[in-house]
From Swiss-Prot:
GO CC terms, sorted: cytoplasm; nucleus
Comp. bias (Polar residues): 1156-1171
E.C. code: 2.7.11.22
Transmembrane region(s): none
GO biological process: regulation of cell cycle phase transition
Pfam family, one: Pkinase
Name of the protein described by the UniProt record: Probable cyclin-dependent serine/threonine-protein kinase DDB_G0292550
Reactions that this protein is recorded to catalyse: L-seryl-[protein] + ATP = O-phospho-L-seryl-[protein] + ADP + H(+); L-threonyl-[protein] + ATP = O-phospho-L-threonyl-[protein] + ADP + H(+)
Disordered, as annotated region: 412-567, 671-728, 763-831, 845-949, 996-1101, 1115-1174, 1227-1324, 1340-1397
Organism: Dictyostelium discoideum (Social amoeba)
Length: 1397
């Protein structure tokens, strides 16, 4: 008790006493209920027990805490509610209006319904136990008699006498919740008439009054009444009998409507079983007819004025009005306000006096409570519930004051009529609301712009206060054209919002007009973002915070677009300024009020400012004061308010945490970061894409999270640029980026959308492509998510190509992605085909499609750290197979599908891609299950090699001796500080986990190439170093995906090649935007396979066996390995064959991927003791088929023994069901390879080949544009042809180091040979030091000496194997003829590689 200061006694009874008190620490006013005698139930006082159980109910008084005093009295601390229902209806039998009665009774029934649904009876419902706060929330109090339904020990002396039902008066001890309903009926009559329904002095008189009104009950109308203990005394033979009669015959009920009488009679039915329940009462027609339930504005004035109010003499003199009609003093505080209606002027004067008195009282209360709230904010001992209640009271009072002031103005202008509503200006206010709504709808954009500027500036300015060194920049930006651009953007957004609301159904039906408008209008937002980013361009780290503000504001605007159709007024306040003002679309009359409140009351408290604005907007929109349908909303009104408050708090807390985390991440992971000196254009382009994607997604709320994340990562892309020094010096001042995207909890694809955003014209081209893709995506709502995400990747393609444009060996990018893409799968889970496309961008395609496709299952279940360049190999094969099917389908279905394309893509600029894509749509309907899985896997594979492979020329150096620490994801250190790397390397790191979160997602930052681990289950991703040289795969991959986006039927990768063919041939005029991407697609088909083979050779996986996943899904696919050629030749026969081809090709590719797992030893995270440079041991492995294959590292000798067998190609039984079988072999492989005496020479040769391969890739990018059509056609004819092309390209890479023309020739040779060299795609090349004759001799010798322990295949398969072998020999002959010497920068030379079967 020492914690409280008792102010006054406010109630007493047999239960104890209730005091008004102040909590000493928080200065919060509370009610203390002290009970000396208490009923104990299950060890707790009854009242405490049930109040604790019901403390979350909105219509139940809130118990803050309870304790026992020194004298063992129970002290319960309640929220303080000054009023109760009795005070509204008690003064001289003053009755309430019907609408006000409905307003409170509805809340009372809601509270009782909550009690009864939890099997609780209150047993003391009466007006004095129904507390009311200034917001007019009714709360049930006094649970001293409460018990549970079915209690066998019930007492009949419960409930106050005037509200006690007849069964209790007659001594019943077997009753239920019907007794509470009887009390509610009595309260209704009391509220409407101002008199008690039954006011007997004892039980017998009370019963007599009841029977006089409703008649004496009998067994007929009350079965079981004769069994009650009080039946004989009250209803015996000597008792008086009363006839039943209608309430209409009673004078005080004559004015009641039929529905009012009906609900009263159903509540006051004598037989308890016939009484209405709370749920039935809440649905009674009485609540749904005029007058509508509304809060008691007039009655609250009466109640407030009737209380003593201290008014100064000066105020009294001011309010003494002398005029022609006489003088009128102020109404005494204790009198009842019933204005005399002798004249309108008299009524006006009296009402004005009341308003003046009421204003003084309300202002005083508001100021007192505001002081209390300010003190409460600094304390933590009082629950948040009290904070919210106090502040809500303040704001509602202030709103009420504003209304009274308006009424005062109306009174002074004599705008009153004789009726009560006009007396207080309610009707006039209704008209004003309607007019304001109309006017504001017309002028919505202007108000919205002004409000947005204020709120955005205030919000961002608050953030800048935390970063003081950015205040000036921010102010300068606001004073410049930024505001103008932002205003224009808001205008456009508002217009588009209206369009979206009006045409939402049309948008769902492939109407792109509104979406296009959104995109175009949002370009203004982009201009704002551009200026904003430019203003902060030279600041370090702070870009993260300010850009976060921009991204949140942009997304919030779009959130309102999605929510406007349902509940603009309320949801608009979920997210600060922009959303706040978006609500003006519906409730615009409150827009001005919102501004005035924000300028005064809410400036220091955005939580409650937003909340109270939402509350007041709800009041207006629901016509709470204007006779609207508030009773329908009242049931959920307070719940929505509470949810709204929590949502605002959670959003703000989450936003602050995200901002703080981003700053911490940036500082922790980027120790080399310095202020960015470039990338302004890139920043703006990225923001453009974000806004565009989001607005196009207005029809699909699932994309909100994606684009939120995208916006966040745009900031990461903006400011995470650094210029390293010393060992990382960039002599040409090329762009260096560290893209650390740790915020991608929702969408990994959007993160990829920000890779290498380096600015320049290519970025702008990327934006144009994105715009078109976004518009195309709107054609199909089911694919909006996929397309929008892929549109971001389209931007990536161009950014990546820009990154590679200045390829002087000085560019370097570390891409660390700590991505948890669970949300991708969840958001797009219904789009089976689209999932792969979205997640495929970053390798998560495997995860999503692992349940659908064997090949994808293989990749998705990999928990090893194998480099995924082999995945590229497989997926490129899939591309070719699918393209083959699609090209033929295009030829057959071209005319019909062109019509479909026109219907689906009315607003697309990139119709080049869409023509052929749409052609495939009609056929893909039957092949979606197979083709799309293959395609999705294809996206994943390409992305495996998709990284900013920026070459870095530097002498070999030791990481531990680097001039600066290298930032690692999650602060991971290099496994071995003595690792040394090759002279020329490219590195990036992707770790994409779909399920079970992040495992070890921070794979090697410095692999010799891109390491991409795609994990479906949480395996351990070790550091794997793979030597990689495919520099342009990023562009190729993404362009493939980009083309896929334009096709909403998800035959994505199948359409790539067909798109290239048709675009190059038929749409040359439009190929300005897409020609490069199409060429890159072709290069992707060739170069990725080259890289796959090359990386298969150069990648050794020591920790492959870390995964526990088996790959049973490949069992079926191996049976088709030898039948690929036949199936491919039958692609035109029917769609089912196409499906088989796709499946066969996937499995075939999977086998190829298995082969590519065997590569030279590169250090993994398990090797921590090697101090020597990386040694690379060549391995030769031919094509094979594995079932239940778990990738394992092999020694070179073991692999040579396997490859020497002539039956190795046809074997189908090489099965490793348990990865642990090869753990000894794994160790031996590590030892054999690391101890190889020729490591240095191989390293040098590999360096040379790496450069040659890189140069050839550059050449391919430029030169293959001329050969795209031919290459695609050849690739489409045979899946394996493309792989053979890749091998041939590898053979010619070294020769192309000096001559680019040879590259073109090799491409043409590849095209000629692609139809024949089907098996070459499954062969792996090997670098050797011996001459060619010795190699061939050794090969034949090994075939004669060594034999495989594996069982042979069938005769048909052997024949196919022989044919393939012959074709491979022909290919070798051509390739060997092109062998030549190439010298690298170090003067070393090596023979051109040959391919061994």
């Amino acid at each position: 008790m020492n914690s409280f200061q008792i102010i006054e006694l406010i109630g007493s009874g047999s239960y104890g006493k209730v005091y008004k008190a102040i909590h000493n620490l928080s200065k919060c006013t509370v009610a203390l209920k002290i009970i000396s005698v208490m009923n104990i139930e299950n060890g707790l006082p009854v009242e405490v027990k049930y109040l604790m159980k019901l403390r979350d109910c909105k219509n139940i008084v809130h118990l803050i805490e309870y304790f026992y005093s020194n004298d063992d009295k129970l002290v319960m601390v309640f929220e303080y509610l000054e009023y109760d229902l009795w005070k509204f209806i008690s003064p001289k039998n003053k009755y309430m209006t019907l609408s006000c009665t409905k307003f409170f009774i509805h809340q009372l029934l809601e509270g009782l319904d909550e009690l009864h649904s939890q099997k609780i009876m209150h047993l003391d419902i009466k007006p004095s136990n129904l507390l009311i706060n200034p917001r007019f929330d009714l709360k049930i109090a006094d649970f001293g008699f409460t018990t549970y339904i079915g209690n066998p020990h019930l007492a009949h002396q419960v409930i106050s006498l005037f509200y006690r039902p007849p069964e209790l008066l007659m001594g019943s001890r077997n009753y239920g919740p019907e007794v509470d309903i009887w009390s509610v009926g009595c309260i209704i009559v009391e509220m409407l008439t101002g008199f008690y329904m039954f006011a007997g002095s004892n039980d017998s008189l009370q019963l007599e009054l009841i029977f006089k009104t409703f008649g004496t009950p009998t067994e007929k109308n009350w079965p079981g009444i004769s069994k009650l203990s009080g039946y004989s005394p009250y209803l015996g033979s000597k008792s008086k009998k009363y006839p039943s009669k209608s309430l209409k015959d009673i004078s005080k009920f004559k004015s009641f409507s039929n529905s009012t009488l009906d609900i009263i009679l159903r509540m006051l039915t004598l037989c308890p079983k016939n009484r209405i329940s709370t749920k039935e009462a809440l649905n009674h027609p009485w609540f749904f007819e005029d007058p509508i339930a509304s809060p008691p504005l007039d009655d609250i004035i009466n109640c407030l004025v009737s209380r003593p109010v201290k008014i100064s003499k000066q105020h009294q003199k001011t309010n003494n009005c002398n005029n022609n009609n006489g003088s009128y003093d102020i109404i005494p505080p204790n009198s009842i306000l019933v204005p005399k209606r002798s004249s309108s002027q008299q009524a006006a004067l009296q009402t004005q006096q009341v308003v003046d008195v009421d204003l003084q009282y309300l202002i005083l209360k508001a100021e007192q409570q505001q002081i209390q709230y300010q003190k409460l904010v600094l304390q933590t001992s009082v629950p948040n519930h009290i904070y919210k209640e106090v502040y809500e009271v303040n704001q509602l009072l202030k709103q009420y004051i504003l209304r009274l002031k308006q009424q005062k103005v109306n009174l002074n202008n004599n705008n009153l009529n004789n009726n009560n509503n006009n007396l207080y200006g309610n009707n006039n206010h209704n008209n004003n609301n309607n007019n304001n709504n109309n006017n504001n709808n017309n002028n919505n954009n202007n108000n919205y712009n002004n409000n947005n500027n204020n709120h955005n500036n205030n919000y961002n300015h608050d953030n800048n206060n935390n970063n003081n060194y950015n205040n000036n920049n921010y102010k300068n930006n606001n004073n410049s054209n930024n505001n103008f651009s932002f205003n224009n953007s808001n205008n456009n957004n508002n217009n588009n919002n209206n369009n979206n609301r009006n045409n939402r159904n049309n948008n769902n039906n492939n109407n792109n007009n509104n979406n296009n408008n959104n995109y175009n209008n949002n370009s203004n937002n982009n201009s704002y973002n551009n200026n904003f980013n430019n203003g902060f361009n030279n600041n370090d780290n702070i870009n993260d915070d300010n850009n976060n503000n921009n991204s949140y504001n942009n997304v919030n605007n779009n959130n309102i677009n999605n929510n406007n159709n349902n509940n603009n007024g309320f949801n608009g306040f979920n997210n600060y300024g922009n959303n706040f003002n978006n609500s003006n679309n519906n409730g615009n009359q409150f827009g001005a009020n919102n501004n005035s409140f924000n300028n005064t009351d809410f400036s220091n408290d955005s939580n409650y400012g937003s909340y109270c604005n939402g509350l007041m907007d709800l009041i207006n929109n629901n016509s709470m004061y204007n006779g609207g349908n508030y009773y329908m909303n009242n049931a959920s009104f307070h719940q929505r308010i509470q949810e709204h408050i929590q949502k605002i708090q959670q959003q703000q807390l989450q936003q602050m945490e995200d901002q703080q985390q981003e700053k911490l991440n940036f500082r922790d992971y980027h120790p080399l970061s310095i202020p960015s000196q470039h990338h302004n254009t890139s920043s703006s382009d990225t923001h453009n894409n974000n806004n565009n994607n989001y607005n196009n997604n207005n029809n699909n709320n699932n994309n909100i999270n994606n684009n939120n994340i995208n916006s966040i990562h745009n900031q990461s892309s903006d400011h995470n640029h650094f210029i390293p020094n010393n060992g990382f010096t960039n002599e040409n001042n090329n762009n260096h980026c560290i893209n650390n995207m740790n915020n991608s909890n929702n969408n990994n694809n959007n993160n990829i959308g920000n890779i290498g955003s380096n600015g320049g014209s290519i970025n702008e081209m990327g934006n144009n492509n994105n715009n078109n893709n976004n518009n195309n995506n709107n054609n199909n709502n089911n694919n909006n998510n996929n397309n929008n995400i892929n549109a971001n990747h389209n931007r990536n393609n161009n950014n990546g190509s820009n990154d590679f444009s200045d390829f002087n060996g000085n560019q370097m990018v570390i891409n660390s992605y700590n991505n948890n893409s669970n949300n991708n799968g969840n958001i797009n889970g219904n789009n089976n085909n689209g999932n792969g496309n979205i997640n495929g961008i970053i390798g998560n395609n495997n995860n999503n499609n692992s349940n659908n496709n064997n090949n994808t299952s293989f990749n998705g279940n990999r928990t090893t750290t194998t480099t995924t360049t082999s995945s590229n190999f497989n997926n490129i094969n899939n591309n070719n197979n699918n393209s083959n099917n699609n090209n033929k389908n295009n030829n057959n279905k071209n005319n019909n599908n062109n019509n479909n394309n026109n219907n689906n893509n009315n607003n697309n600029n990139n119709n080049n891609n869409n023509n052929n894509n749409s052609n495939n749509n009609s056929i893909n309907n039957n092949t979606n299950n197979n083709n799309n899985n293959n395609n999705n896997n294809n996206g994943n594979g390409l992305t495996s090699s998709y990284a900013n492979h920026f070459q870095y020329n530097h002498p070999p150096f030791n990481i531990s001796n680097a001039p600066h620490p290298i930032p690692f994801l999650n602060n991971q250190s290099i496994p071995n500080s003595n690792y040394q790397f090759l002279n020329r390397f490219s590195f990036s790191n992707y770790s994409n986990n779909n399920s079970n979160g992040l495992a070890n997602n921070y794979q090697n930052p410095f692999g010799h190439g891109a390491t991409n681990s795609n994990n479906n289950n949480s395996g351990n991703n070790d550091h794997v170093f793979g030597h990689n040289t495919f520099n342009f795969n990023q562009n190729n991959n993404n362009n493939n995906n980009n083309n896929n986006n334009n096709n909403n039927n998800n035959n994505n990768n199948n359409n790539n090649n067909s798109n290239n063919n048709s675009n190059n041939n038929n749409y040359n005029s439009n190929n300005n935007d897409n020609s490069n991407s199409n060429s890159n697609n072709n290069n992707n088909n060739n170069n990725n396979n080259n890289n796959s083979l090359f990386n298969n050779f150069n990648t050794h996986n020591n920790s492959i066996n870390r995964g526990n996943n088996s790959f049973d899904s490949f069992n079926n696919g191996f049976n088709h390995l030898k039948n690929n050629n036949n199936n491919i030749n039958n692609n035109n026969n029917d769609i089912n064959n196409n499906n088989n081809n796709n499946n066969n090709n996937n499995n075939n590719n999977g086998i190829t991927k298995n082969n590519t797992q065997f590569g030279p030893n590169i250090l993994s995270s398990t090797q921590t003791s090697h101090n020597s440079p990386v040694s690379l041991t060549p391995i030769s492995v031919s094509s094979s088929s594995f079932s239940n294959y778990s990738p394992t590292s092999f020694s070179s000798s073991s692999m040579e023994s396997l490859s020497s067998s002539s039956e190795f190609l046809s074997s189908e039984s090489l099965s490793f069901t348990n990865s642990n079988q090869f753990s000894p072999l794994l160790n031996s492989a590590s030892q054999d390879i690391n101890n190889n005496s020729r490591s240095s020479r191989h390293r040098s040769k590999l360096n040379i080949d790496t450069k040659g391969n890189n140069n050839n890739n550059n050449n391919n990018k430029n030169n293959n544009n001329n050969n795209n059509n031919n290459n695609n056609n050849n690739n489409n004819n045979n899946n394996n042809n493309n792989n053979s092309n890749n091998i041939n390209n590898d053979n010619n890479n070294n020769s192309n180091n000096n001559s680019n023309s040879n590259n073109n020739n090799s491409n043409s040779n590849n095209n000629n040979n692609s139809n024949n060299n089907n098996n070459n795609s499954f062969g792996l090349k090997r670098y050797v030091d011996d001459n060619e004759e010795q190699l061939l001799a050794n090969q034949k010798k090994k075939k004669n000496i060594k034999s495989s322990p594996l069982p042979s295949a069938s005769s048909s398969q052997q024949s196919q194997t022989q044919q393939q072998h012959q074709i491979q020999q022909q290919s070798q002959t051509q390739q060997q003829s092109q062998t030549q010497k190439i010298e690298n920068n170090d003067g070393l030379s090596v023979e051109n590689p040959i391919v061994l079967d």
